Amino acid sequence: MRGALLLLVLLSAQHVSTSQFWLSVEVEQIDWTDGCLTTALCSHPRFQLIKDLLPVNEKVTMNWPIVEHFDKESHRPFVSYWPSGRTEDISMSAQVVGTDRTYGFPRICDQSPSVRIFPEEHKKIVAHLEKEKPTGKPPMDSLKIKVKGKCFNATMTVIKHTERCPWCPDPKEITIIGQEPGSEATGLRAGSAAWLFGSSSSLISDDRIVHIGVLVLAIVAVLSSTAFAIILVMYLRNKRLVKETLKKPRFHPYISVKGHEIAEDNCRYDLPWEQQQRPLTYWMTSSNKSSESTMTSPLDSASSLHGSGGSHQNPHMYNSHHHQHQQQQNAHPSEMYHSTYTRDGYQTYRPPPPSVHPPIFPPQTQLFHPPTYSTQRHVTSPNSSRNDDSGLESV
């Protein structure tokens, strides 16, 4: 039974010792030998501490320059972390390193032998002291060691931390304020309500600010996309309209309408030339007033003149014709222009008479022709025609 118990104790001790731990080393005092480093031909010396895990040959080093204020600088703690291993396998040594003054290569100017920090005997002593003076706190392993070289003697304090890191606070010393489960649920509800509707201390939280920013950016992106689409559609539409206007002629040919102007009282269509140059004949008129005064065309008047031949014109006839022409000119315009005539089924207004006055011929003198075979004087009357002579008298 005793052997089994010892085996269990050793296994438990080994399990505890192989867990992670921290080692903190603080240099308390260093004594230097005068002129030692000068005679050793070491330039730019530095004091260096080396921690070594012997089974795996893992080393952690730290050094300080040897200057005027070295005592103040060296009092800083040197903390090393070991994820696995035993504290009994940790050894420590001190060195003075620098460069050779003659050749300039790095060299070790002075060093001390390696010393185990926590040997097996020290562990037994600590366990015995803990039994004699039990305390509520877990044992904190700490001890002072001295290392000695040719030019220095150093005294250091080493502390082992197995439960927590040196800078971590003790959880037993932290005061924990308890909270009931009901109050916790009430606190969660109050927190959610404050996030939604805001609270007196903080109106909006960081999450709400992020959500609002994302929403604003989304709205700006949608508006920008809509405006761009509208501008693009308007541009394409204007471009199409410009192309259509370029295909069509801009200027239409100018057509003068002066030649086609028609007076209100004139005819509605172009009349033949013979109707424009002379008045209308009797059969084309329909008014009573125009039928009373018979108008003849210039051609008819000329034929009548030629028909009269050498006979003199009747003055009464000429005067009546002239009187009728004056009456026609003095007639009211409405009576002249409102007379209509029909031709080819179209009824239109009668055009005004020409403004050219008929020619006035001077009165002709009467000619007396003496007879050839008879002594009887023959006087031609004005009413006689030139065709009355059969031609026998003149022969």
Curated annotation (Swiss-Prot):
<feature type="compositionally biased region" description="Polar residues">
    <location>
        <begin position="364"/>
        <end position="385"/>
    </location>
</feature>
<dbReference type="InterPro" id="IPR040426">
    <property type="entry name" value="C05B5.4-like"/>
</dbReference>
<protein>
    <recommendedName>
        <fullName>Uncharacterized protein R10E12.2</fullName>
    </recommendedName>
</protein>
<feature type="compositionally biased region" description="Pro residues">
    <location>
        <begin position="350"/>
        <end position="362"/>
    </location>
</feature>
<feature type="compositionally biased region" description="Low complexity">
    <location>
        <begin position="286"/>
        <end position="306"/>
    </location>
</feature>
<dbReference type="Pfam" id="PF25330">
    <property type="entry name" value="C2_nem"/>
</dbReference>
<feature type="region of interest" description="Disordered">
    <location>
        <begin position="286"/>
        <end position="395"/>
    </location>
</feature>
